[in-house]
Amino acid sequence: MALEKSLETGDGQEKVRKQTAVYVYEAPLRLWHWVTALSIVVLGVTGYFIGAPLPTMPGEAMDNYLMGYIRFAHFAAGYVLAIGFLGRVYWAFVGNHHARELFLVPVHRKAWWKELWHEVRWYLFLEKTPKKYIGHNPLGQLAMFCFFVVGAVFMSVTGFALYAEGLGRDSWADRLFGWVIPLFGQSQDVHTWHHLGMWYLVVFVMVHVYLAVREDIVSRQSLISTMVGGWRMFKDDRPD
């Protein structure tokens, strides 16, 4: 929510309104963000080569295990992403209220939709002045849920379903995700959707990085440094 709507009333509100720094993101959340970012990069690069392997390798096959290393890195990064996501869900329950913004999008609030439209206009350079937000702005919150949360769940489910094929029947992955391939129809369909999901996340990462840098420069609060140190730094003391 906007800054002035998330603080106390009276003299206390005026005092907080003029703060130029608020502690937002706790250490476990920041660590999860950067570990997840690294795992997505590894998954994207290795997944690309798994989908489009190198045409040939010189020498004897026994001396060239490059694709084996690529697959191992992909599987390891997949575990990191999935376990980290489960940890992130846990932290939504035990962390501060900003830790829950990723999962709880207040679509039932009219004010949220109004602020969402303001953010859309701001990103399209149709608004002169942006609003101030302690946590995610409405557009960022919606994008994180639709692209990251939905995307990460989809990629984890389809990825472990394909991983279960290698582990074999009655493996833990087959027991948990064996229903996925029959749902899609066949293994190749899951491969295709998993591959398309990679590009879905690639687009998200590109837009996310661009907007984070843009907002750090032209908005009224910090973004990148906030995810490093946890503090939201404001460039002015106006309330909204």
UniProtKB/Swiss-Prot annotation:
> What residues form the membrane-spanning segments?
31-51, 75-95, 142-163, 196-213
Q: Which Pfam families match?
A: Ni_hydr_CYTB
- Print the keywords alphabetically: Cell membrane, Electron transport, Heme, Iron, Membrane, Metal-binding, Transmembrane, Transmembrane helix, Transport
InterPro entries registered for this protein in UniProt: Cyt_b561_bac/Ni-Hgenase (IPR011577), Di-haem_cyt_TM (IPR016174), Hydrogenase_cytochrome (IPR051542), Ni-dep_Hydgase_cyt-B (IPR000516)
Major place of residence: membrane
Compartmental location? Cell membrane
Source species, domain of life: Bacteria
**Heme is among the record's keywords:** yes
According to the UniProt record, one GO cellular component term is: plasma membrane
Q: Which GO terms describe its molecular function?
A: electron transfer activity; heme binding; iron ion binding
Which family does the entry's similarity section mention? Belongs to the HupC/HyaC/HydC family.
Please state what the protein is called: Probable Ni/Fe-hydrogenase B-type cytochrome subunit
Q: Which gene encodes it?
A: hoxZ
